[in-house]
């Protein structure tokens, strides 16, 4: 099937092969060991414990479905703005070909504030997880639509062995069953179908009955207004990953505060 996700995964495999030739595992391990870690899960739980929305604020220049979201794109400034206006964590796109992201953007955003940072990319190999640790990420994303269950479990175990938090992302009930076999407390429900890029926030609401109370539900994509936030919080969904709404605003941090606080 030649859909968007399959094309992205094919490119990832080519990128991994090239990266492994230029930066062998042992070199990456040395870089990773020199990096400190910030508590991604703890930051989300702290916001929730205080009765606030736990916002993972995204640093994203573009997307395949929407094109360029922000022309004036300075990751350090965006990160500082998010931190000043109540974000719990950051998410930074590192995919170059499809999202115009960069490893450098993650490094710049993390250096500009004290928030924990998620590497937002399409991870299909353990090498990318070590790469994430070496670049300074505190958490990684695993996308159920791109992985079978045994591989997802192996990748999670490797991430945890490096001290990284794992956000597992699903879009339907079958993927949620797959995700619930993992140990991570972070369950992301993507309201956007990665194969068609169609979006509905009802996707999150329709899966809440499957989720044990000890897990943290993170609703992702399509959260564009205070009304969307209120709808989710009324359903006891209190963690959010938001990018587009902030990136399109003149002041991303101020838009975060307007929508959530």
Curated annotation (Swiss-Prot):
One of its GO terms (biological process) is L-tryptophan biosynthetic process. The keyword Ribonucleoprotein does not apply. Its EC number is 4.1.1.48. It comes from the Bacteria. The keyword Lyase applies. It catalyses: 1-(2-carboxyphenylamino)-1-deoxy-D-ribulose 5-phosphate + H(+) = (1S,2R)-1-C-(indol-3-yl)glycerol 3-phosphate + CO2 + H2O. Disulfide bonds: none annotated. Keywords: Amino-acid biosynthesis, Aromatic amino acid biosynthesis, Decarboxylase, Lyase, Tryptophan biosynthesis. Pathway: Amino-acid biosynthesis; L-tryptophan biosynthesis; L-tryptophan from chorismate: step 4/5. GO terms for molecular function: indole-3-glycerol-phosphate synthase activity; phosphoribosylanthranilate isomerase activity. PANTHER family: INDOLE-3-GLYCEROL-PHOSPHATE SYNTHASE (PTHR22854:SF2), TRYPTOPHAN BIOSYNTHESIS PROTEIN (PTHR22854). Belongs to the TrpC family. This is Indole-3-glycerol phosphate synthase. It comes from Burkholderia ambifaria (strain ATCC BAA-244 / DSM 16087 / CCUG 44356 / LMG 19182 / AMMD).
